[in-house]
Regions:
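Histidine-rich, glycine-flanked metal-binding segment
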Residues: 25, 36, 40-80
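Boundary at the C-terminal end of the N-terminal hydrophobic targeting segment
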Residues: 19-26
């Protein structure tokens, strides 16, 4: 069995500039003299960004600072929108084998559960990701079929409600697969050669695997039928109608206001997920579709956005091309498919910029790579008018760097989340400084 894993080779977050240098003291501040990478438009040399009450209110050259505003001189620096990890489990899972982890629910259908309620704001991985420029991410509740509601959060706050951007950005569905030897879904956390599961799952015959697949598909179809009946009964105010939180959570899916975030790795599951979405008349986002390159015309014809898994991973099968995960982003770009890149990890969101960078070496245009972890991610998650670029009216999620954030030698020197400066201190940095000072 081939387990997918990544080796961590990045240590940039251990080195950095002063944590809150030139931090604004008021609600209005002007970033002046930097190279501003808006992402939605051209790069602005010697540009300025004016922020008021957490929102960007001005972008351009030679902006004037209002009375009382803090002016931050950023000559020689770069300003980018904060990165968005469009699929992760930070704060949900500390140690994969620990019973204290709260990232996976039992039961086939749990659409009423919201990931944000289980997030631990004190997780040490949150400041580590933040210090490398990740300002928000999509928390993923895992489950057998429908795991719950994915929540988009800011990586700053002492309580769940203060971190929440959207408590219900999508609903997670692990699309059924014919698995003769099941592979853990979103297995992107391995730092060594060991699988994340304590016991390797036993192989089963194809006939048994196909039967299990058919049972799950039948259960999924029946569940959607039940939701439709529930919606009709609710609208008709039928006698004896009893509210059901599971069905209530699914009504926005049927109405088209909330998409399903569908995990479908192989070609067969991807085709099945698209056919299921057509039959149910629902919107979907394809999550971690490793074999998307095999069905590009199908995905494009249905206008389905894609959230790719990390590029820094091994091929899915032993006979896959060695560079398969590196080239898929460019394949999607050339096909005209909107896509983002995510880590699907409980502790490696800090490496998000390098996941995008790897695709650049294999053909993806540089600007498109950064869009895949900013503006594209925001648009796929329905937040394109609020996040993902440096434009007037958007939330001031900004990072200041001394170079290209997708380069491992670049330092993130300042981070603003919702217009507020945040600390770049991390446990890793404290340990680095502790042992650096050792006699």
């Amino acid at each position: 069995m081939l387990y997918r894993f990544r080796r961590i080779a990045w240590s940039g977050i251990l080195c950095g500039a002063p944590l809150l240098a030139q931090a604004p003291s008021g609600d209005v501040f002007l970033l002046r003299g930097a190279t501003v990478h808006t992402i939605s438009g051209p790069v602005i040399e010697d540009g300025s960004v004016l922020v008021r009450n957490g929102k960007i209110v001005g972008v351009g050259h030679n902006l004037s600072a209002p009375d009382g505003a803090t002016i931050i001189d950023l000559r020689g620096k770069h300003v980018y929108p904060g990165m968005i990890d469009a699929g992760a489990m930070l704060g949900l899972e500390k140690t994969s084998s620990s019973q204290a982890s709260d990232g996976h629910e039992i039961g086939l259908f749990n659409p009423q559960l919201r990931a944000v309620t289980a997030v631990n704001p004190a997780d040490e991985q949150i400041p580590a990701a933040r210090a490398n420029g990740v300002t928000s991410l999509l928390e993923m509740p895992m489950g057998d079929l429908i795991g719950g509601q994915l929540s988009l959060i800011h990586l700053d706050g002492s309580a769940n409600d203060s971190m929440t951007i959207s408590a219900s950005a999508a609903i997670y569905l692990r699309f059924p697969a014919i698995e003769t030897r099941p592979v853990p879904v979103h297995d992107h956390d391995d730092d060594d050669d060991e699988p994340t599961t304590a016991v390797e799952p036993e192989a089963v015959s194809y006939s048994l695997a196909k039967k299990a697949f058919e049972v799950k598909m039948q259960a999924l179809d029946t569940f959607f039928e039940d939701v439709r009946r529930y919606r009709v009964a609710k609208s008709a105010k039928a006698p004896g109608f009893a509210p059901d939180r599971r069905y209530e959570a699914m009504i926005p899916v049927l109405e088209g206001t909330t998409p399903m975030f569908v995990a479908a790795t192989r070609e067969r599951e991807i085709r099945g997920a698209i056919a299921f979405a057509d039959a149910q008349k629902i919107r979907i986002i394809l999550a971690d579709p490793f074999e998307a390159y095999k069905v590009l015309p199908l995905i494009k014809s249905h206008n389905i956005p894609v959230v790719l898994g990390p590029t820094l991973t091994l091929p899915l099968d032993v006979d896959d091309d060695y560079d398969r995960s590196y080239t898929t982003p460019n394949d999607l770009f050339k096909a005209g498919i909107t896509f983002a890149i995510a880590t699907f990890s409980s502790r490696l969101s800090r490496n998000l910029p390098y996941q995008a960078a790897a695709a650049v070496s294999f053909g993806l245009p540089h600007d498109e790579a950064y869009k895949a972890i900013t503006l594209n991610a925001a648009e796929i998650l329905g937040m394109g008018k609020r996040l993902g670029s440096i434009d007037e009216g958007k939330v001031a999620d900004l990072i200041v760097t001394d170079g290209d954030p997708m380069e491992t030698m670049t330092h993130v020197t300042q981070v603003f989340i919702d217009g507020k400066p945040v600390s770049l201190d991390t446990r890793q940095k404290r340990l680095y400084e502790k042992y650096l000072a050792r006699p």
